[in-house]
Swiss-Prot record:
Its cofactor is Co(2+); Zn(2+); NAD(+). Keywords: Amino-acid biosynthesis, Aromatic amino acid biosynthesis, Cobalt, Cytoplasm, Lyase, Metal-binding, NAD, Nucleotide-binding, Zinc. This is 3-dehydroquinate synthase. One of its GO terms (cellular component) is cytoplasm. NCBIfam families: aroB.
Length: 360
């Protein structure tokens, strides 16, 4: 059964297509494009898992393949340069198409290449992780890391279509699955407490139909937010809950020790503790949030003792979400969220990092 959500965008509208047959919507899109070349971008892990799929891609289409190393280190200008070289050697034109097949790193990387090659060519996202299906593939954010700083270079460039197949989730490790759940917990805690409660109960039964429904709900919430605030003026900032500190943690561990979903889980608990301190959130809500992460074996405290509050502060001061001389945190409230700017020179933040993260 195929189901389609249409996302409205000020750049170009695009569909999110839920299907077990990824070829049908891809073929339909390519038929409208005419005679085109395709570059499939993936990573070694996904390629090894789905070699028959990539063989069929090569059989069915005039296509080329770029395989990146797995992990956040591939989200770099060096990898972008390698892909540019491949496109130029293959004589790609502005009418040709990039197709990303992978998780958030591959989607962001391929989307950034599509946004910048010939000042923009078409691209399709086929997200293969839970995190990329419910979050990173939707909304048009593309980009790469730069000199250890997370997502420092990027753009808003929506895909021409997103093809979501739950079949890809069958090969996810428990750790990768939990990272996707982390983003769903974020959406539920801020925007839909009923979804949050379902996620809290889900580990006990693992009903696959319920999982599909929760994925659909999470995607609907992300769609609603990015349609109302595509360029992150206000409402979309809510989706940065946990990400200010989370991105700093990722940067300091070079995108290796903690995966994205794990780093933002720590960030969300930190911001929730701060919200309790500011009397914006109840202790009961904080404990429920911690329980949700613990149910999926997600970290809620910083275990990398080598990270100091001073080192985190240094990275936080470079965060792209900052406003002037203020670091912007997103604090959850009983009924939603608030943007919480704090001056970069304010010593309270250093104290909060030390006390709430229990680090030096």
């Amino acid at each position: 059964m195929t189901q389609t959500l249409q996302v409205k965008s000020r750049i170009n509208d695009y569909p999110i297509i839920f299907t077990d047959d990824i070829f049908q919507p891809l073929n339909q899109f390519l038929a409208e494009k005419g005679d085109v070349k395709l570059l499939f971008i993936t990573d070694q892990t996904v390629f090894d898992l789905y070699q028959p799929l990539f063989r069929r891609f090569q059989q069915d289409y005039d296509s080329y393949l770029h395989i990146a190393a797995p992990g956040g280190q591939s989200k770099s200008l060096e990898e972008v340069s390698r892909i540019y070289d491949r496109l130029i050697r293959a004589n790609f034109s502005k009418k040709d198409v990039i197709v990303t097949v992978g998780g958030g790193v591959i989607g962001d990387l391929g989307g950034f290449v599509a946004a910048t090659f010939y000042r923009g060519i078409s691209y399709v996202q086929i997200p293969t992780t839970l995190l990329s299906q419910v979050d990173s593939s939707i909304g048009g954010k593309v980009g790469v890391h730069f000199k250890g700083l997370t997502n420092m270079i990027g753009s808003i460039y929506p895909p021409n279509q997103i093809i979501v197949s739950a079949k890809f989730l069958d090969t996810l490790s428990e750790r990768e699955f939990a990272c996707g759940i982390s983003e769903m917990i974020k959406i539920g805690f801020i925007h839909d407490r009923k979804l949050f409660q379902q996620l809290l109960a889900f580990p006990k039964d693992r009903n696959q139909e319920q999982l599909r429904q929760m994925i659909f709900q999470a995607i609907c919430h992300k769609k609603r937010v990015v349609e109302k605030d595509e360029f992150e003026g206000n409402l979309r900032m809510s989706l940065n809950f946990g990400h200010t500190l989370g991105h700093a943690i990722e940067a300091l561990c070079h995108h290796e020790l903690y995966r994205h979903g794990e780093a933002i889980a720590i960030g969300m608990v930190f911001e929730a503790k701060l919200a309790v301190q500011q009397q914006l959130l109840s202790q009961q809500d904080l404990e429920a949030l911690q329980a949700a992460f613990e149910a999926y074996q997600l970290p809620t405290t910083l275990e990398a003792k080598s990270m100091t509050a001073e080192a985190l502060m240094t990275v936080l001061k470079t965060d792209k979400k900052n406003s002037g001389q203020h670091i912007v945190l997103i604090l959850p409230t009983t009924k939603g969220y608030v943007s919480f700017p704090i001056a970069k020179h304010d010593s309270r933040l250093l104290d909060w990092l030390r006390s709430l993260l229990d680090i030096a």
